[in-house]
């Protein structure tokens, strides 16, 4: 997935457990990762991290935060967050597609924010 991005424009950290065993439709999950990583590149100031451990995939960036009023809606079709995060090329469908694909796999995605914005995929069994 990362080969499509300008890797020199950001500081990227990847931390993957050596024992990965994910049961999924590979093509659909590539769409999920592409959407989340694309958003990370779009909104990051400098840092992006991709972490896999303990049945969780966490894609984080150090960009602008998502307004609290938007958090519960960003996975809805056609929803676009506040103006500072809006992209004229955005359809508002990316995160809705992510949610639908994850639902098909019985996985969940939530957003947690501290100094960074973290999209956390939990692979429920």
Please place each PLM-identified region on the residue numbering:
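Conserved catalytic submotifs in the C-terminal HATPase_c
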Residues: 11-21, 53
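Short beta-strand/loop element within the Bergerat-fold HATPase_c
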Residues: 47-56
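A residue-level detector for a conserved hydrophobic packing site
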Residues: 29-30
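Short helix-loop "hinge" at the ATP-lid/N-box region of the Bergerat-fold HATPase_c
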Residues: 40-41
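Conserved glycine-rich
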Residues: 46, 106-107
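Short conserved segment of the HATPase_c
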Residues: 66-79
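Conserved micro-motifs of the catalytic ATP-binding
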Residues: 21-24, 85
């Amino acid at each position: 997935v990362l080969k499509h991005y300008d890797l020199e424009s950001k500081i990227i950290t990847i931390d993957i457990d050596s024992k990965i065993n994910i049961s999924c439709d590979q093509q659909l999950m590539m769409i999920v990762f592409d959407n989340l990583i694309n958003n990370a590149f779009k909104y990051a100031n400098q840092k992006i991290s991709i972490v896999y451990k303990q049945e969780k995939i966490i894609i984080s960036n150090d960009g602008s935060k998502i307004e609290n009023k938007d958090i519960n809606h960003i996975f809805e079709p056609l929803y676009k967050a506040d103006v500072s995060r809006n992209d004229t090329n955005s359809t508002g469908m990316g995160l809705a597609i992510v949610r639908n694909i994850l639902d098909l796999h019985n996985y969940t995605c939530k957003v947690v924010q501290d100094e960074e914005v973290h999209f956390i995929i939990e692979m429920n069994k």
